[in-house]
Amino acid sequence: MYQDLIRNELNEAAETLANFLKDDANIHAIQRAAVLLADSFKAGGKVLSCGNGGSHCDAMHFAEELTGRYRENRPGYPAIAISDVSHISCVGNDFGFNDIFSRYVEAVGREGDVLLGISTSGNSANVIKAIAAAREKGMKVITLTGKDGGKMAGMADIEIRVPHFGYADRIQEIHIKVIHILIQLIEKEMAK
């Protein structure tokens, strides 16, 4: 009944991944991001992560697998997803939705920390404001974006961009794979 649809969806996902893999710059960016994160942890820093919708879930997934575990047991790493509902509702109500991440970065971000900002379009105003707040604090910035990078293009120390111009879910599928690879590489770097 839906076999053709299922095959088409899986083929499109595979094609998106294949296109991402064609650009060696993506591989190098992932490696540089993992080393940057591990170096921050080794120096006593932490990572703050943020995004909206599915990207928010990815930010939370990233943090929980750093503080908890990925594939094997190991010490937890300092990671916070900016996801506290009371913070988000307070700042959203009192200041505006565009400030929900930047206010948190202003409150807890420190020089030597890293911000991971996730936006499939690269145009999320609240993530862009978080990047600006991170810069003010002397933090490093890594972004996961899609399409042409949007307004976030060029704003990060390291941008990992999925150049897919279709639906956002294809970009998110690559983002979650990148997140898992980052964690795996961080674990290897931390074991050195």
Swiss-Prot record:
Q: Which pathway does the protein contribute to?
A: Carbohydrate biosynthesis; D-glycero-D-manno-heptose 7-phosphate biosynthesis; D-glycero-alpha-D-manno-heptose 7-phosphate and D-glycero-beta-D-manno-heptose 7-phosphate from sedoheptulose 7-phosphate: step 1/1
Q: Which Gene3D superfamilies match?
A: Glucose-6-phosphate isomerase like protein, domain 1
Q: For this protein, what reaction is catalysed?
A: 2 D-sedoheptulose 7-phosphate = D-glycero-alpha-D-manno-heptose 7-phosphate + D-glycero-beta-D-manno-heptose 7-phosphate
Q: Name one GO cellular component term.
A: cytoplasm
Q: How many and how are cofactors bound here?
A: Binds 1 zinc ion per subunit.
Q: Where in the cell is it found?
A: Cytoplasm
Instruction: Tell me the ranges covered by the SIS domain, including all copies.
Output: 37-192
- Could you say which enzyme class this protein belongs to? isomerase
EC number(s) on record? 5.3.1.28
Which superkingdom does the taxonomy of this entry point to?
Bacteria
Give the binding site residues for Zn(2+).
H61, E65, Q172, H180
Q: Name one Pfam family in it.
A: SIS_2
State one molecular function term (GO): D-sedoheptulose 7-phosphate isomerase activity
Keyword Cell membrane in the entry? The reply is no
Cite the record's note on assembly.
Homotetramer.
Q: Which HAMAP family match?
A: GmhA
Family stated for the protein in its record: Belongs to the SIS family. GmhA subfamily.
Q: What else is known?
A: The reaction produces a racemic mixture of D-glycero-alpha-D-manno-heptose 7-phosphate and D-glycero-beta-D-manno-heptose 7-phosphate.
Please give the function described in this protein's UniProt entry: Catalyzes the isomerization of sedoheptulose 7-phosphate in D-glycero-D-manno-heptose 7-phosphate.
This protein's name: Phosphoheptose isomerase
